[in-house]
Amino acid sequence: MDLNAIIEKMETGDQDAALTALQTYNKEKSQCFSFTSGEEEDRERLGELVLSFLERDLQPSCQLACLETIRILSRDKKSLSPFATRHAMQILIRHAGLGQGEGVTPEIPDLEVIVEALKCLCNIVFNSEAAQEAAADLQLMVGLAERLKQCREPQWNHDVRFFDLRLTFLITALRVDVRAQLAHELRGVSLLSEALDATFGLCWPDMYEVARAGFDGCSELPPLGRQETERVMEILKILFNVTFDSNRRHVDEEEAATYRHLGAILRHCIMSSAEGEERTEEMHSHTVNLLGNLPLPCLDVLLMPKVQQGSIEYMGVNMDAVKVLVEFMEKRLDRGNKLKETLLPSLNLLTESARIHRETRKFLRNKVLPPLRDVKNRPEVGNALRNKLVRLMTHIDTDVKHCAAEFLFVLCKESVSRFIKYTGYGNAAGLLAARGLMRGGRDPGHYSEDEDSDTEEYREAKPHINPVTGRVEEEQPNPMEGMTDEQKEYEAMKLVNMFDKLSREQVIQPMKIGADGKMTSMEPHELHHLASQQFGESNNSDSDSDTN
């Protein structure tokens, strides 16, 4: 039906005529996501008429048709102005059942109308800053929080719950003030933890130990249903928004208890599966992202459950969750695409867990850096997890290579000699330079004094290992053998002049280790002086060796 014809029907004010026209339009445009240019004014006019209808006492079918039309029209960013006003948002919020003190909510709400209004709000809030501001002013988050509290009430179906959560995610992602309101005023972490609890159907055998109700003691849980998985992922995304800065600030005792309670539920998330591998990985990804936001001391809940039959035990501690996190990290590492977005959350989480929890660090070290036996290959060669991580230490992305190096450095208890042993000096140089550790030593850290037991193979090969490459190298002939002192000096100065030229042309920048252990630039005269000094020392050592 022509847009002008629909507008004419709406302008008559007749509810039946409007219903027929809108139902026809909605059917024709149900899959329309791009709109004809030049009709913006007509679409805006239709939007205004539909909103005016929604202010009247309409039969449910007409309400639903009006909201469906708004949902379709709100896909067009160029025709949003009728819907982004405070008054329009008020109308839609009321139809979504989220209004604050505006009339009585019916005893039996029309769920179809509520869901359609929520879909409209999602589109409009996503596409319009003015609508976001209006939503904040109208206390939309308060209405959403009130309904989130009813997470165990049977009257709300999946669609209402899901779009409540989707709208909450959007408004907290787009408005910092609403995010803060949910986090603090509305006690968002507790509220959303309860929603997670209800969605999973959890029971609590102990204070920070979680089980699925009806499956307590089962070694393998059934996959979470599709609808429950969708809601869980929305909740995890909202929690990520509201906890974004929590790992960077001090939390009091009450907050720590709240985060530990959430952490216990997140442990259950990471140990659960969804219907299909792709869905499971997506749920685990959101869980890992959120775990990275939790205050570090609260991550101890990952290790709290009792060791049961079939559990991975290490030093008397249940390592099931840590094992799953390592497997998740390695899967992302093997995939190799978008490493910064996909790998770093899990790698950072494991790094910080290892830094603060001795049992986790020792378990991870046993998995990633087992006693060294392979001394013939470079540390970056091979398919072991250590080899894969060492390869990342020279990755083109600075964040990726830094995180990989930091993880291995922490597993080495921030000992420079141990770090070089497992990675080779050439791979380790970047992190050591950044930390001011080029002269060796150890970063100050709180690590226990356990032994680094060397294998027989490593002890035998150690004197022959090239510290730069991290492997035993075949003996190479001395290229200066047979040269006179004058020839050696000539070759040395030739090399210095080549470096000098490259430096002046800013192709390279010669560096030296400063007094603080960090790298600093070398001036050309320093390079010449160093070469002369080294050559002089070489001559002296040759003279000494010739003396009887």
From Swiss-Prot:
GO terms for molecular function: G-protein alpha-subunit binding; guanyl-nucleotide exchange factor activity; protein folding chaperone. It is found in: Cytoplasm, Cell cortex; Cytoplasm. Its main location: cytoplasm. Pfam families: Ric8. One of its GO terms (biological process) is G protein-coupled receptor signaling pathway. Keywords: Chaperone, Cytoplasm, Guanine-nucleotide releasing factor. Chaperone that specifically binds and folds nascent G alpha proteins prior to G protein heterotrimer formation, promoting their stability and activity: folds GNAI1, GNAO1, GNA13 and GNAQ. Does not fold G(s) G-alpha proteins GNAS nor GNAL. Also acts as a guanine nucleotide exchange factor (GEF) for G alpha proteins by stimulating exchange of bound GDP for free GTP. This is Chaperone Ric-8A. It comes from Danio rerio (Zebrafish). The lineage of its organism: Eukaryota, Metazoa, Chordata, Craniata, Vertebrata.
